């Protein structure tokens, strides 16, 4: 279990309230597929992923990015039991989809980059980033739990 300070909880909740999952999610997933092209193997049913432009314009990438980002709400609402909240997702990604657990870390890093670019230093301050990184690390750990 992660021990959260009141300031960290407030930062994560505040930042989450500002996030448009329909904007950040597709952006983050598209960047993942472009920057780390080996991750595309999990998305063979998404159609054309042959170029950066194809990935950025792919409606299935956008829809799944929104779903993935929206899934973080589960962690925001269950900050005291993220591992329990993500148990089924972890099992699915481990046993059914066979996602390399390092991909969760890569997506978390890219999500942080997207948030920093979107909100800038006046909102995404070092304190907010510190809390967000701690939150993302907890999510990554929870998603990778079934791999151990």
Curated annotation (Swiss-Prot):
Which tissues does the record link to its expression? Answer: Red blood cells.
Q: Does the keyword Transmembrane helix apply?
A: no
Q: Which GO terms describe its cellular component?
A: blood microparticle; haptoglobin-hemoglobin complex; hemoglobin complex
Q: Does the keyword Transport apply?
A: yes
Alphabetically ordered keywords of this record: Heme, Iron, Metal-binding, Oxygen transport, Transport
What does this protein do, in the record's words? Involved in oxygen transport from gills to the various peripheral tissues.
Q: Which Pfam families match?
A: Globin
Q: How does it assemble?
A: Heterotetramer of two alpha chains and two beta chains.
The family line of this record is: Belongs to the globin family.
Protein's UniProt name: Hemoglobin subunit beta
Globin domain ranges (all copies): 3-148
Listed as disulfide-bonded, the cysteine pairs are none
A molecular function (GO) term: heme binding
* List of residues binding heme b: 64, 93
Which domain of life does the UniProt lineage start with? Answer: Eukaryota
Origin species, per record, is Decapterus maruadsi
Please give a single GO biological process term from the UniProt record: hydrogen peroxide catabolic process
């Amino acid at each position: 279990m992660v021990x959260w300070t009141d300031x960290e909880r407030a930062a994560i909740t505040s930042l989450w309230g500002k996030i448009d999952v329909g904007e950040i999610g597709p952006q983050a997933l598209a960047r993942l597929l472009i920057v780390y092209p080996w991750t595309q193997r999990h998305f063979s049913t998404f159609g054309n992923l042959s170029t950066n432009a194809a990935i950025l314009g792919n409606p299935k990438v956008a829809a799944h990015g929104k779903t993935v980002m929206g899934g973080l709400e589960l962690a925001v609402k269950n900050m005291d039991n993220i591992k329990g909240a993500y148990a089924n997702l972890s099992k699915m990604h481990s046993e059914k989809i066979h996602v390399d657990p390092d991909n969760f870390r890569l997506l978390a890093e890219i999500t942080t980059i997207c948030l920093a670019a979107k909100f800038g230093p006046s909102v995404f301050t070092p304190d907010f980033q510190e809390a967000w990184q701690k939150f993302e690390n907890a999510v990554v750990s929870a998603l990778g739990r079934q791999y151990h």
